């Protein structure tokens, strides 16, 4: 990829505009989860160390576009950054017609979604943003799949458009996992519905050696294999699709294994009693909420021998401990594996946290939708823009 990297540029005395993903939860004016803010700090600190005058922009929440709403103000983010960085940090509310920023200072722009035209990638808005800087840095992988004024349009008009360290790191990790993976390659795709991940399953079934399906997705594959799934969440209209994916994988020597044992209950609740059953013994009134220990061990063995692991989605309802053993075993196997592993998606990251394996996963992706679209083989607009500007 012919993308310019911020780390390679001379930024001394330059006005540098960084698009970060600082969309964090806020309660009573205080940031309640700072993972994205912490992830952005090295990029901001590097720009400061290189002698830049730094401007930072992001969206926060989903305000009505074009309307100021104090509930979605960037002020709590500014307060956090002011403590985390050893330099002056301030909020700029009216910045589109120009903003004063000194070398060694950080100015955070108010929520980009307060600007009319942000979502539609408005050209006039993009040009105004571009006019504010000498160098535009796209560092928000989580929004790279959206063609918006602050993620795409501005980069088309800025004097220089480059990738920040966080984005570059993400693209390197995904490239390593998907473009030239060490074999065998194993993908674990969980989630409630085949329909929401069909293109991911399609894409991965063409490149992996083993495609492990979990959650509601697995129920559709279990039904496709001819077993009763009782009252489980599954998609009857996608059984033929599941059969086709299994046949396609087999035709190229790959496999989509179906669980041999499952954990069931009569209701979906934190207090539901879990029962272990063979996959062939699920009764009409039961729901499958996890894979059984035999299936978990079989999958752990597959993971242990892998060269590359891509994990997107749990294999059971791990939020309830009685249905979490399958996901826990998978997490342990990934942690113990010597393979290059990449994990992404909200539920997956919650499982990584719950089972304490964050430091054992080679790379944790910060992008939800962008991670999925990359797995689908789709071109991400922000990445395409950076390639065009780098050519």
From Swiss-Prot:
It is an enzyme of class 2 (transferase). GO terms for molecular function: ADP binding; ATP binding; phosphoglycerate kinase activity. Keywords: ATP-binding, Cytoplasm, Glycolysis, Kinase, Nucleotide-binding, Transferase. Substrate binds at residues 21-23, 36, 59-62, 113, 146. The keyword Membrane does not apply. The keyword Nucleotide-binding applies. InterPro entries: Phosphoglycerate_kinase, Phosphoglycerate_kinase_CS, Phosphoglycerate_kinase_N, Phosphoglycerate_kinase_sf. GO terms for cellular component: cytosol. Pfam families: PGK (PF00162). Disulfide bonds: none annotated. Pathway: Carbohydrate degradation; glycolysis; pyruvate from D-glyceraldehyde 3-phosphate: step 2/5. It catalyses: (2R)-3-phosphoglycerate + ATP = (2R)-3-phospho-glyceroyl phosphate + ADP. Belongs to the phosphoglycerate kinase family. Monomer. This is Phosphoglycerate kinase.
């Amino acid at each position: 990829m012919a993308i310019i990297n911020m780390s390679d540029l001379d930024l001394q005395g330059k006005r540098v505009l960084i698009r970060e993903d600082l969309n964090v939860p806020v309660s009573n004016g205080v940031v309640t989860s700072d993972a994205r803010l912490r992830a952005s700090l090295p990029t901001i600190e590097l720009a400061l160390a290189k002698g830049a005058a730094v401007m930072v922009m992001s969206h926060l929440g989903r305000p009505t576009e074009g309307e100021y709403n104090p509930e979605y103000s960037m002020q709590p983010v500014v307060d956090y950054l002011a403590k985390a960085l050893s330099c002056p940090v301030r909020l700029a509310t009216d910045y589109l017609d120009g903003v004063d920023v000194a070398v060694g200072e950080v100015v955070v722009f108010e929520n980009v979604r307060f600007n009319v035209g942000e979502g539609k990638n408005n050209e006039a808005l993009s040009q105004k943003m571009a006019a504010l800087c000498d160098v535009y840095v796209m560092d928000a992988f989580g929004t790279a799949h959206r063609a918006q004024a602050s993620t795409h349009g501005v980069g088309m008009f800025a004097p220089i458009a480059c990738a920040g360290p966080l984005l570059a790191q993400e693209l390197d990790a995904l490239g390593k996992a998907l473009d030239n993976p060490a074999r065998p390659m194993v993908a674990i795709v969980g989630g409630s519905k085949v329909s929401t991940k069909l293109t991911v399953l399609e894409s991965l079934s063409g490149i992996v050696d083993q495609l492990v399906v979990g959650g509601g997705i697995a129920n559709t594959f279990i039904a496709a294999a001819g077993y009763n799934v009782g009252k489980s969440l599954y998609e009857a209209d996608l059984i033929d699709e599941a059969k086709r994916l299994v046949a396609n994988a087999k035709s190229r020597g790959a496999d989509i294994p179906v669980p041999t044992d499952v954990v069931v209950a009569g209701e979906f609740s934190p207090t539901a009693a879990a029962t272990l059953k063979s996959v062939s013994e699920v009764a009409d009134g039961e729901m499958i909420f996890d894979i059984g220990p035999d299936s978990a061990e079989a999958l752990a063995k597959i993971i242990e021998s892998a060269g590359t692991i891509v994990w997107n989605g749990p294999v059971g309802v791990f939020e309830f401990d009685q249905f979490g053993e399958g996901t826990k075993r998978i997490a342990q196997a990934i942690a113990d594996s010597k393979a290059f592993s990449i994990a992404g998606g909200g539920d997956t990251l919650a499982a990584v946290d719950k089972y304490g394996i964050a430091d054992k996963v080679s790379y944790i992706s910060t992008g939800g939708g962008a991670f999925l679209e990359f797995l689908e083989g789709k071109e991400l607009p922000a990445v395409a823009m950076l390639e065009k500007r780098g050519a």
